[in-house]
């Protein structure tokens, strides 16, 4: 029995009907389908409507600030209270008081301070009625007990409404992974956010990738505080890797993170090799150690420009690490502030550091507070002071510097005309001979007078050369009149977290926070004091542009206020021509500053300083030569840092040798014999103390 073949079912089109191709003009239509019962593929046609017919309509995105047009304080307060009633949450009295005090609502308001308020999810949701109507420079959410839900909601609002340029989320330990994920999205999407303070807010392994991705791709952040954020290990590795490609971040604070001297320090050193835009790196209260400092120095050595401030306060550094740093300093061209306080460096470490500092061309501030220095170390520091025509601030507090060391420092200040602040302990040290106590007081007064003399000269030159910029003085020159009972100089912030001013600091220590000083032009929005924590470094500095015109007798130094980084001060130092008669030279056009690498011999001190080097010492001092061989250190550290220590000199005549070196440097043509006798007595006293 034969079964007749059945026709294939029709092929439905897009609308469920049979789609037949229209017959082409002039060609006969097929009389019957193919034998297999299917339509030919070539017979199908697909058509689309014209571009004008595709889009039937368009809706513009909602304007985030549509509620902020001609808004009044009463409207904001009413909307906030209504939202609290709708969400059945409590109103924040602190917020209501601030809202009532606001006047000009058309611009960014200074600060929204919610510090210490407990913010749950519903309370955060009610805040949207404020954020959709008002924008702020600073939003302070410190210690507000945020959880994942509340943090996510707040960060989404701040990102959508661009509510803040400076945000403080410190001391919120429970924002969790979702909170950090929302924070990372805010960092990536908010172009106005410049400052983020996340101190004591843990950034753990599962949250770090979100923040790292935000910092690597697109981030407008210029300042990032991550103190005590549990970064050691994988979080720091992700963060450092991302920051290699970040060109916007200027300040990075990583204190109290238990960073170690191997993997963590290697990541930081690698970061410095590739990132030349980072200006401040604060590593205080970590465990960098000498091995970690070697990695950091290796990164610094490869920088042509970049880091301006390096804070290594309390990192268990010894004289071994100072050998690495002494090799690196001649090669650094931008480092202006170096804080080594509270490290057991000792006299030997300062000797290793001295030659590098003398060959350096950029360091303006040096912190050596509580570094176990004695008179011997003070003599080495005095040699550097006598050679340096650019050092502005020096901190030597909490060291056992007695009569001999003070005498060396006093003599060095006689030939130095740049040092404006020298911090020493106010009370004299105990001496075996009671008469030396009075000698110490007299020497402290001489040192104080020397700094005041330099300060007055700098102020006079600034007023003479730059009358339009009278208010933009350096922090060292902000005091109106030196007080007779002040310490030897204004206090240099030494890097230790200090909730209250120490008794060793005077009114000049806080002068950089006064309102009469001009703000830096690039930052016209200054955060309120509730957000900006005190930075205890010696202070970031902003160097003058390399192409700025300068003459052989005039040098302009631009430095920032210590601890802020938001204010800039300018001082002009004019060097008078030598007293001896010279034939008139033809005027020369301004020349760019000489390249600092390889380092040449230090330039002559300013007017009044006497060149005491003999003809044999006029040649450039070469930097210490790296060792020829040595086993490499782990993590790819160069072998030259492994054997950087110079040979150990004999212990006997070492003290006198250092003192004699200073004696030769400070000898003057007029009172040479008198200075030699005074310095010889100081060296003998310091030698007796060390025995």
From Swiss-Prot:
Q: Where is the composition biased (Polar residues)?
A: 468-481
Q: Name one GO molecular function term.
A: protein phosphatase inhibitor activity
For the modification Phosphoserine, the affected residues are: 50, 56, 561
Answer yes or no on keyword Repeat. yes
The alphabetized UniProt keywords are: Leucine-rich repeat, Phosphoprotein, Protein phosphatase inhibitor, Repeat
Q: Where is the composition biased (Acidic residues)?
A: 505-523
Its domain of life?
Answer: Eukaryota
Q: Which Gene3D superfamilies does UniProt cross-reference here? A: Ribonuclease Inhibitor
What interactions and quaternary structure are annotated? Interacts with PPP1CA.
The UniProt entry's sequence similarity note says: Belongs to the PPP1R37 family.
Q: What task does this protein carry out? A: Inhibits phosphatase activity of protein phosphatase 1 (PP1) complexes.
- The protein, known as: Protein phosphatase 1 regulatory subunit 37
């Amino acid at each position: 029995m034969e079964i007749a073949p059945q026709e294939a079912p029709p092929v439905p089109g897009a609308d469920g009907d049979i789609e037949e191709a229209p017959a082409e003009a002039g060609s006969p239509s097929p009389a019957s389908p193919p034998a297999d019962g299917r339509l030919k593929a070539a017979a199908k046609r697909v058509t689309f409507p014209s571009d004008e017919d595709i889009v039937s309509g368009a809706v513009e995105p909602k304007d985030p600030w549509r509620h902020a047009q001609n808004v009044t304080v009463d409207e904001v307060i009413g909307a906030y209270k209504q939202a609290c009633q709708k969400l059945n949450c409590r109103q924040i009295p602190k917020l209501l008081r601030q809202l009532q005090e606001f006047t000009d609502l058309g611009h960014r308001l200074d600060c929204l301070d919610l510090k210490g308020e407990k913010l749950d999810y519903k309370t955060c949701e009610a805040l949207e009625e404020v954020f959709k109507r008002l924008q702020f420079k600073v939003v302070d959410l410190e210690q507000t007990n945020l959880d994942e839900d509340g943090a996510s909601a707040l960060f989404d609002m701040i990102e959508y409404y661009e509510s803040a340029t400076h945000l403080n989320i410190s001391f919120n330990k429970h924002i969790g992974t979702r909170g950090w994920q929302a924070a990372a999205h805010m960092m990536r999407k908010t172009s106005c956010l410049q400052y983020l303070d996340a101190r004591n807010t843990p950034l753990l392994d599962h949250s770090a990738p979100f923040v790292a991705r935000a910092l690597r791709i697109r981030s407008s952040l210029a300042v990032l505080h991550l103190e005590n954020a549990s970064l050691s290990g994988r979080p720091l590795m992700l963060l450092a890797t991302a920051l290699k490609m970040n060109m916007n971040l200027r300040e990075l604070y990583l204190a109290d993170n238990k960073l170690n001297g191997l993997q963590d320090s290697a990541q930081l050193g690698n970061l410095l090799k590739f990132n030349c835009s980072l200006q401040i790196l604060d590593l205080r209260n970590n465990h960098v150690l000498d091995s970690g400092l070697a990695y950091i120095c290796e990164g610094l050595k490869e920088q042509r420009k970049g880091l301006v401030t390096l804070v290594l306060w309390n990192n268990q550094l010894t004289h071994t690490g100072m050998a690495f740093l002494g090799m690196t300093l001649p090669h650094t061209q931008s480092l202006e502030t170096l804080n080594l306080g509270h490290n057991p460096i000792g006299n030997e470490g300062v000797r290793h550091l001295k030659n590098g500092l003398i060959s350096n061309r950029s360091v303006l501030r040096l912190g050596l507070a509580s570094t176990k220095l004695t008179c011997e170390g003070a003599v080495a520091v005095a040699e550097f002071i006598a050679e340096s025509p650019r050092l502005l601030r020096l901190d030597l507090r909490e060291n056992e510097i007695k009569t001999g060391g003070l005498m060396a420092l006093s003599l060095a200040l006689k030939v130095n005309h740049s040092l404006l602040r020298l911090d020493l302990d106010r009370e004299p040290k105990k001496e075996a001979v009671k008469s030396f106590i009075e000698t110490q007081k007299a020497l402290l007064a001489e040192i104080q007078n020397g700094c005041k003399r330099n300060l007055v000269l700098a102020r006079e030159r600034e007023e003479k050369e730059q009358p339009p910029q009278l208010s933009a003085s350096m922090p060292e020159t902000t005091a109106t009149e030196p007080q007779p009972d002040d310490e030897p100089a204004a206090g240099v912030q030494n890097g230790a977290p200090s909730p209250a001013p120490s008794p060793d600091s005077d009114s000049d220590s806080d002068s950089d926070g006064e309102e009469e000083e001009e703000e830096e032009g690039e930052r016209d929005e200054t955060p309120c004091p509730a957000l900006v924590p005190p930075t205890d470094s010696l202070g970031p500095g902003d160097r003058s542009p390399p192409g700025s015109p300068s003459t052989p007798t005039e040098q302009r130094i631009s430095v920032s206020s210590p601890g802020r980084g938001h204010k800039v001060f300018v001082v002009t130092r004019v060097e008078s021509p030598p007293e001896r008669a010279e034939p008139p030279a033809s005027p020369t056009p301004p020349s760019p500053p000489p390249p600092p690498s390889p380092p040449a011999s230090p330039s002559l001190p300013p007017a009044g300083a006497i060149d005491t080097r003999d003809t044999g010492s006029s040649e450039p001092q070469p930097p210490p030569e790296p060792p020829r061989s040595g086993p490499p250190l782990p993590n790819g550290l160069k072998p030259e840092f492994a054997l950087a220590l110079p040979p150990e000199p004999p212990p006997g005549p070492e003290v006198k040798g250092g003192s004699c070196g200073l004696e030769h440097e400070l000898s003057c043509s007029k009172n040479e014999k008198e200075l030699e006798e005074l310095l010889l007595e100081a060296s003998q006293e310091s030698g007796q103390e060390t025995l």
